[in-house]
Structures are given as structure tokens and as C-alpha cells.
Amino acid sequence: RFLPWRKKVSKKQKEYFTLVSEFMLQQTQVKTVIPYFINFTDKIPNLISLSKINDNLLMRCWEGLGYYSRARNLKKTAIKIVKDYKGKLPNTIDELKLLPGIGDYTSRAIMAIAFNKKIIPLDGNVERILKRVFYLRKENEITKDYLNSKKNFFGVSNRSGDYAQAIMEVGALVCKPTNPLCLQCPISKNCISFKKKDFEIKAKNKFNKIKYFEAKIYNSKNKYLLIKNNKFNFLKNLLIFPMDEVKKEKFQSFVGQRLNVKMSNMDMKIFINKKNKINK
């Protein structure tokens, strides 16, 4: 696929594009990221401008993409690179993992894509290929270390960055979670799941904490009161309606409109309190 962060640019710009795109792709699908990446890099074209950008402008460029701590960490990373690495993106996994918001996967993705190192990052797409090729079905027993040990199956290439992305593309576009396109797959002849005609991989059951909130909607002539959020870790420093966390029992006593919002680490149940008016 043509993706905006894959277009031919200078080496330094490629490093910046890789850094920004990998932050945006954390917990977000490619098709969602594309327009945000284009807008972000148009307005913030390099590490220097990112390190100096006003926080409000930064959040405006990120607005709607979610997981706003990524934007804050991305700016912190840019500041650290400019200050400690003379504006050059570090080119070792250990150094990259010292930067805010960069963990094992992101550091490996940057090494492969930006620096052409012989590394295959283990994302969900690569995991799915390995589980199907080796017919791994005991989800709770499959560790990251075990899956990493199986990556030798893919071999190596002199174009390591392109090769790593190609493998991830096979997972995204061919070895799909449902209805995989096995007849188009370049590795189906080595795939045990294909031979068994059994492609299902059960997802882990994930149970989030449930938290309860009351959102207070103050309005006057269709003008609404918003406040800067310094209270909650989610949507930090963004404008929200005044909101309090409440006990389950109190939430259940409320009568009126409610919202259910699913986040990565919790399920939010929000009561919309429209009774409040701004008094002149």
C-alpha cells in the first residue's frame, strides 16, 4: 500500500516520519491515522518544530485521534532528541527505549524502518501469521519471547525496512483475522493452519474496569461551559464538560440520559446532567 509515511524523502525526514507514524499507530488503525499524519506533518514538519510547538496547537493537531498521552510523549521525545542527541534520532534499541512513549515494539519498528536494521517488529499482524504458520492455539501459553523465537521463519533481507513492512502488510491484507486470503498468501505452502483448514485464533478475553461519572452540562443560550481537564488522566489538559467520578450506587440513582464509552483501560458510564444552567 502507498502510505504517506512511506513516500520517498530525505533520510532525516524519513526518520521523523517513522517516529510520528509509529506513535500514531500505537493502538490505532492505519486508515484512521492517514489523514491525521498528513495534517500533523504539514503543520509540524520536523523534530525542531515539534520540540518547540505550543501545547494547545499540538493538541489541536492531534484532536480526534485519541490517546492524547501519545502526543505529549511525542513532544517530550522531540525535546530530548534535540537536547541530548543534537536533533538526530538515536539508532539503537536501548537508546530509543529511553525516550518517552517508546517501548519494545516501537523501538524495533523504528530500527527496521528508519535505519534498515535486520529486525522484524512483533505487531498483531506478525503474531497472527506466526500463530497460523505454526498452528499455535493455546493463547495464554504463547509468550512474546516464544513468538519472537519463531521469527527466524521469515529469514532476512538487505532491504530490512521494506521487508519488515511487507510482512506486516501480509498480516493486515492477506492473513486477516477473519476470512484470510490463503490462495494469495506467499507463505501458505509452509502454513500448518492452511493445511488443516483451521484458521481461527481465539482472542483473549479482556475485562476493563467500569467507572462511573456525572457530566454537568451548563449552558446559556446554547453556549456551553467547558473546563481544562486537570483532574483525570484521560483527556488530560483538554477541554471537557465539568465531570465528577461517582460511586456505582449514586450513578444508579440518576434518572436521565447515560452514555457508555469504551476506552483502552476502562469502560466509562456517564450520566448527562442537563439540569444545570448558568446564572447571569
Show which residues each predicted segment covers.
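Intrinsically disordered, low-complexity, charged terminal extensions of DNA damage-control enzymes
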Residues: 1-2, 7, 169-280
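Catalytic cores of DNA base-excision repair glycosylases
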Residues: 1-181, 187-192, 196, 210, ...
